[in-house]
Design a protein with these regions (language model features):
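N-terminal strand-loop-strand
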Residues: 1-18
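Unchanged
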Residues: 22-116, 120-123, 127, 136-145
Length: 145
């Protein structure tokens, strides 16, 4: 599940991302992942099962060290968007994720400049940057299985 961030958030305005945010004091990265998922899209942690963790990565633009956790739900979770943080939710099927290839020269607008970046083009959204890197690692793990 991917989200499009609103223009109200401090970092990565209008970009497609995974639910997430800063780790609170005395909180684990895994607990922050669950809390942010609940805050942003309303999915309660009691319905989620852990599938593990991907590699952490650093984003120099926002100075975040991103910790990626994979969660699974046996039932279709009810989505409740926090419209101050999330503009839209995109449900990407596993088949669509696996079948999608990275497009190397995708033009995007970044801070008033048009640049070309590697990105995934899903039916409803384009993922680039850290989100594309996370998707690439997940696809590699799935393809190795």
């Amino acid at each position: 599940m991917l989200t499009k961030r609103t223009d109200n958030v401090e970092h990565h305005k209008g970009q497609v991302s995974l639910p997430g945010g800063a780790i609170d004091k005395n909180e684990t990265a895994q607990n922050a992942s669950l809390r942010e998922t609940k805050e942003e899209i309303g999915i309660d942690s009691s319905s989620l099962k852990s599938l593990g963790q991907l590699s952490s990565l650093y984003t120099p633009v926002s100075y975040f060290n991103i910790h990626v956790f994979l969660w699974y739900s046996e039932t279709q979770p009810q989505i409740k968007i926090n419209d101050s943080e999330v503009d839209q939710v995109y449900k990407i099927s596993l088949d669509e994720l696996i079948d999608n290839n990275l497009v190397l020269n995708t033009p995007i607008n970044k801070s008033g400049f048009k640049i070309n970046v590697p990105a995934y083009h899903f039916n409803e959204c384009i993922c680039w940057g850290a989100t594309a890197m996370i998707i690439t690692e997940l696809k590699d793990i799935i393809n190795e299985s």
